[in-house]
Curated annotation (Swiss-Prot):
The keyword Transferase does not apply. Keywords: Cell membrane, Disulfide bond, G-protein coupled receptor, Glycoprotein, Membrane, Receptor, Transducer, Transmembrane, Transmembrane helix. Residues 1-62, 120-146, 202-232, 304-322 are extracellular. It is found in: Cell membrane. It comes from Homo sapiens. Gene3D superfamilies: Rhodopsin 7-helix transmembrane proteins (1.20.1070.10). GO terms for cellular component: plasma membrane. This is Prokineticin receptor 1. InterPro entries: GPCR_Rhodpsn, GPCR_Rhodpsn_7TM, NPY_rcpt. It holds the Pfam family 7tm_1.
Amino acid sequence: METTMGFMDDNATNTSTSFLSVLNPHGAHATSFPFNFSYSDYDMPLDEDEDVTNSRTFFAAKIVIGMALVGIMLVCGIGNFIFIAALVRYKKLRNLTNLLIANLAISDFLVAIVCCPFEMDYYVVRQLSWEHGHVLCTSVNYLRTVSLYVSTNALLAIAIDRYLAIVHPLRPRMKCQTATGLIALVWTVSILIAIPSAYFTTETVLVIVKSQEKIFCGQIWPVDQQLYYKSYFLFIFGIEFVGPVVTMTLCYARISRELWFKAVPGFQTEQIRKRLRCRRKTVLVLMCILTAYVLCWAPFYGFTIVRDFFPTVFVKEKHYLTAFYIVECIAMSNSMINTLCFVTVKNDTVKYFKKIMLLHWKASYNGGKSSADLDLKTIGMPATEEVDCIRLK
C-alpha cells in the first residue's frame, strides 16, 4: 500500500474544504484525503447510496493492481534475490557500480516480500480497508517511502560515479571507505527525510456508505498544518525527483558526448575498442533506466500536484478511481524495470547464480565435497566479458 495523506482538525469537527473529500452520508464531518506520495484511496467522488468499491470500474482496477503486485513480488523478489546472492558469493562482482546497484536490489527486495503482500490485502482482498493495526500501517508505509528514496539516491550516485569514471578517467577511483560512506549516506538521507511520513501515518475508521466501514491507513496531517505539508511535498519533489533527474540527465549527456562524439586519440587496439563497446552498453542501459524512472514517476508526482494544489480538477470526476490505479501501477512498475535491466541485461549475475546452484547440487550429490573445495572452484572462476564490462575501471 502506498503512502497516503489527508487533513483533519484536532477536534475532528471539520476539515479543510480546499481539497477533495469523502463525505459521511450520515452527517458526520467530511474527511479530506489529498495525500503526499501516492494517491488518496478514498479521495474519489462517492454516491451516498452506492459503494464505489463494488462498482465494475473498481473491479477492473482491482485486477490491474493485483497483477502489478504479483509481478513485483515475483520479478523483484526472485530477481533481486539472485543479484544479492551472486554478489555475496562472488568477489569478482563487488565493484563500486554493483555495490550501488545492490542498494536498489535490497530496497526493492524488502518491498516485494514485506510491503506487497500487505498491499495485496489492502487493495485487492479487503478493497481499501486496513486490518493489520497501527504499527504495521506505519511500518509498511514508511518502508515503501524509504525504498523509493533509496532507489532515487542510488541511481543518482551511479550516474555521478559513471560521470567521474568516464569523463575524468585520470582521477583516482573511489576508495572502499569512501564507497561505504556513500552507501551509508544514501540510506541515511532516505531514512531521515521519510520520517514525517511515518510520524503522520495512522489509521482512521471511515463510514463509506450507510453502516459500512473502511479503515483508512495513511498520512493524516492536522488541518492547520496544510502549509507544512505542501512545503514538505515540494521539498521532496525537488530533492527526490527534479534535482536527481536534472543531475542524472546532465551526467549522461556529458558521458554520451565523451563516448560517442569524441574521437579517441592514437591507435585503437582491439582491447580499447572492446572497452569502449562495454562502456557504451552500460551507459545505454543506465540511460534507459533513467528514462523509465522519469516515465514511471512523472505521472505520479504530476497527479499528486494536481490533486493537492488544484483539487477542483477532480471534483465529481467519475473516472478518478481508474486514473488513480493507472498512475499507481505505472509508478509501481519502475521497480520491475530496474530489476530486469540490472539483473538480466547489465551483468551475468544469473549465470553466476546458476553456477552456485550447480556446485551445491553436485556437492550434495557427491556427498564428499567440502565447502573449502567449493570455495576454491568458485573463486577460481574466470571473469566473463560482461563482468569486465561492468567494472569500467
